[in-house]
Amino acid sequence: MFKFNTKVYYEDTDSGGVVYYANYLKFIERARTNLIQELGFSLKSLSEKYDCHFVVKNINCNYIQSAKLEDELIIQTKFIDIKKASFELEQNIYKRDRVIFKSKVLMVNINLSGKPIKIPDSLSSVINV
């Protein structure tokens, strides 16, 4: 389980001070980037060394409760499944120990031509399902 902390800034909210719905996807994207870094990689190095580019193929999300300006949020990410060229994550956002957003995200590894390719062994070997 990987955790990423963030705060709701003015730029994340609508005119009512509530997080705009699409920004929850930004929050979980940032958490995924930090997850890769915590595993010892960077998106840039994966691209340069392996022609490896992770894209979202499918996302299923459930908005449970709104976050508001200056709320402290925790994004918890865990791997659910890994296959040859893809992996699935569960990413949930918490506010004060209460889940406010749930998602399952299917990521596919592609090359610059857009073709699915095998996840590098050096990365798949450190992914715990």
Where is each model-derived feature located?
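Terminal targeting signals and extreme-terminal segments of soluble enzymes
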Residues: 1-72, 80-129
